[in-house]
């Protein structure tokens, strides 16, 4: 076993200039991640220097067998915390051989919105709070829970410590450090209200980079849970009953909101979000109706409301933002399995480009 460990941790830079690039893409469900690796002749400093590639889309539910080739375009890369050295993780989006984005490629549409001059001028910042649940592999039941049973009621677990309150911290901390190593702008972690559930935050990130970083962080997390023999779940309500669901609260601000007088801009943006509530809900993740019930720190899925420091609202404004008259707001509606390209670009489109 020690030899296997030594080989896994082998530092290639001692023997060769070649590097390994792990190409990562979103699979046919729109939430699953796939990847495969190839050897490059040497280190690269920009995605444009990476060779294009393709994969069998018929095996991922993204193309028919008689025309199965799906093409990658390389968009962003990060340092590889698993292979280390000059090796990299590459975030790709996906196209037909004719150059058309395939249906699961939501990055393409998001990039159009984020490149719009009115959006570029406002420098949109995002901070995404990604909640997730760790499950025991063989029984698909939360980590630390008795099989077929339940722990004590919620209360002691949020940001809790101790062997009877926090399960999976080694995975969480490994992920935190791996993301920092990779160059992802991960800004924190914490234990969540339901035991076995955790959260990491990415941001502030500008525009399309928020989606790239969240997907890269999700990939790293699932690779770590694979090593640990634990299952990663992004189900927005993994356990029915008196247990919190899992969301991806999305914090947002524009240049105008961050400047003096920005609170009035924030209120106008929230009003526009309310007018398009149904459209946003439809795009904010599968199964969200099981989570947005009006209980467990959520607003009812059919109701739009906002408030200061109100975690039962659709949109929460912080006390500091109200006091200072500028800042940001939090959209609490997105589910944990949301596509960050969809959510971030839709918020920008509604608040900056859409005319009621």
From Swiss-Prot:
<comment type="subunit">
    <text>Homooctamer.</text>
</comment>
<dbReference type="InterPro" id="IPR036651">
    <property type="entry name" value="Gln_synt_N_sf"/>
</dbReference>
<keyword id="KW-0547">Nucleotide-binding</keyword>
<dbReference type="GO" id="GO:0005524">
    <property type="term" value="F:ATP binding"/>
</dbReference>
<dbReference type="InterPro" id="IPR008147">
    <property type="entry name" value="Gln_synt_N"/>
</dbReference>
<dbReference type="InterPro" id="IPR027303">
    <property type="entry name" value="Gln_synth_gly_rich_site"/>
</dbReference>
<protein>
    <recommendedName>
        <fullName>Glutamine synthetase</fullName>
        <ecNumber>6.3.1.2</ecNumber>
    </recommendedName>
</protein>
<dbReference type="GO" id="GO:0006542">
    <property type="term" value="P:glutamine biosynthetic process"/>
</dbReference>
<dbReference type="InterPro" id="IPR027302">
    <property type="entry name" value="Gln_synth_N_conserv_site"/>
</dbReference>
<feature type="domain" description="GS beta-grasp">
    <location>
        <begin position="19"/>
        <end position="99"/>
    </location>
</feature>
<feature type="domain" description="GS catalytic">
    <location>
        <begin position="106"/>
        <end position="356"/>
    </location>
</feature>
<dbReference type="InterPro" id="IPR008146">
    <property type="entry name" value="Gln_synth_cat_dom"/>
</dbReference>
<dbReference type="InterPro" id="IPR014746">
    <property type="entry name" value="Gln_synth/guanido_kin_cat_dom"/>
</dbReference>
<keyword id="KW-0067">ATP-binding</keyword>
<dbReference type="GO" id="GO:0004356">
    <property type="term" value="F:glutamine synthetase activity"/>
</dbReference>
<comment type="similarity">
    <text>Belongs to the glutamine synthetase family.</text>
</comment>
<keyword id="KW-0535">Nitrogen fixation</keyword>
<dbReference type="Pfam" id="PF00120">
    <property type="entry name" value="Gln-synt_C"/>
</dbReference>
<dbReference type="GO" id="GO:0005737">
    <property type="term" value="C:cytoplasm"/>
</dbReference>
<dbReference type="InterPro" id="IPR050292">
    <property type="entry name" value="Glutamine_Synthetase"/>
</dbReference>
<keyword id="KW-0963">Cytoplasm</keyword>
<keyword id="KW-0436">Ligase</keyword>
